[in-house]
């Protein structure tokens, strides 16, 4: 595999259509978008087959944690939108079968009680969330007099870089263990903690991981930290071979007690999550606030930047390719 060239995000953006297979109708495909507060967004294409395999990955690592995604009661805490008529009643969630889907947008000192009351009432076996979504709740819980009486197996976090400070506070506040999941929108790698270790187990059925130095060479024996290069197995529609993820991984030399012969990462170093301030002066994680908009086709958006000078209002700067300038109202529609 070392004879293949390394693919960068910029190269993908400039040659996007060349990476999509030609023998399928593009209208039948699904697309998702990568990015951050200052970044060049990338549209990643896939089909239903990849989506099924992606779901199977979740089922697999949850089974490794002795959890059943179909039967176990759980809470999802992300940037989901909740109907206004519910918000007006201090209900910031919807219930679907054995799952409560909560919105992280409304967590503050005034609403904390309602979130905690619902969590206590529902008694989930696990909570699935982003670090930046659960952290404000953990912080408020840690500072207050309200205590939860739960029997949580885990809090499972993904989608962002998890700091040691976040892990420690979340575990302390909820009296349970945090399981970190590593993945990315491009879908070439999935890694997870296990019952015996917080080290990330890179699932071999999903793709190949390489850790390379600044000269794109394999790490020397004594060096543990390198850029993560991913080769995915499951996305026939949009194959990625030796893709530079932009993440930095720290190699682990231990053999995990779980017995799985996976490549292990001690940790992944990434960008600490950014926040914006809403009208009520609450900190809102910027990733779910912006990147719920996967309906947008970001092709033609070379770069974007998010700036906030006034609470409750953000300015999005778009650097568009010349052809897309004619269609800029299409993009602006989604940000109103």
Question: What is the predicted function of each stretch?
Answer:
Residues 45-47, 78, 130-131, 182:
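Glycine-rich, histidine-containing beta strand-loop boundary motifs that form or position
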Residues 59, 63-94, 102-105, 159:
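Conserved AMP-binding loop of ANL adenylate-forming enzymes
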Residues 94-336:
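Active-site glycine/GP-rich loop and adjacent strand/helix microenvironment
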Residues 2-6, 84-86, 189-192:
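Short, solvent-exposed polar/charged micro-motifs at secondary-structure junctions
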Residues 44-46, 88, 240-242:
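A short secondary-structure junction signal
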Residues 1-33, 39-72, 121-128, 148-150, ...:
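Nucleotide 5′-phosphate-binding alpha/beta core
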Residues 38-41, 81, 161, 185:
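Gly/Ser/Thr-rich beta-alpha loop segments that engage phosphate groups in nucleotides
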């Amino acid at each position: 595999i070392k004879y293949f060239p390394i693919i960068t995000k910029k190269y993908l953006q400039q040659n996007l259509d060349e990476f999509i297979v030609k023998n399928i109708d593009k209208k039948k495909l699904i697309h998702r978008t990568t990015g951050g507060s200052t970044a060049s967004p990338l549209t990643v294409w896939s089909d239903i087959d990849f989506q099924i395999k992606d779901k199977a990955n979740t089922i697999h690592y949850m089974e490794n944690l002795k959890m059943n995604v179909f039967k176990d009661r759980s809470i999802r805490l992300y940037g989901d939108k909740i109907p206004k008529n519910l918000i007006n009643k201090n209900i910031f969630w919807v219930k679907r079968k054995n799952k409560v889907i909560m919105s992280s947008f409304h967590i503050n000192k005034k609403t904390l009680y309602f979130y905690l009351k619902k969590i206590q009432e529902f008694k989930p076996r696990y909570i699935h969330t982003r670090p930046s979504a659960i952290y404000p709740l953990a912080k408020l819980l840690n500072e207050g007099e309200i205590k939860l009486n739960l029997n949580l197996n885990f809090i499972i976090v993904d989608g962002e870089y998890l700091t040691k400070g976040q892990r420690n506070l979340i575990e302390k506040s909820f009296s349970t263990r945090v399981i970190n999941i590593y993945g990315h929108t491009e879908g070439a790698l999935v890694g997870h903690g296990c019952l015996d270790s917080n080290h990330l187990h890179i699932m071999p059925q999903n793709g190949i991981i390489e850790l390379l130095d600044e000269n794109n060479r394999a790490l020397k024996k004594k060096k543990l930290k390198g850029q993560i290069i991913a080769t995915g197995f499951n996305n026939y529609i949009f194959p990625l071979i030796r893709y530079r993820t932009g993440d930095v991984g720290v190699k682990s030399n231990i053999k995990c007690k779980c017995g799985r012969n996976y490549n292990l990462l001690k940790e992944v170093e990434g960008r600490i999550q950014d926040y914006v301030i809403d009208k009520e002066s609450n900190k809102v994680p910027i990733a779910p606030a912006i990147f719920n908009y996967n309906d947008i086709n970001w092709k033609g958006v070379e770069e974007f930047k998010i700036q906030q000078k006034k609470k409750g209002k953000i300015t999005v700067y778009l650097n568009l390719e010349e052809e897309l300038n004619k269609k800029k109202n299409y993009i602006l529609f989604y940000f109103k």
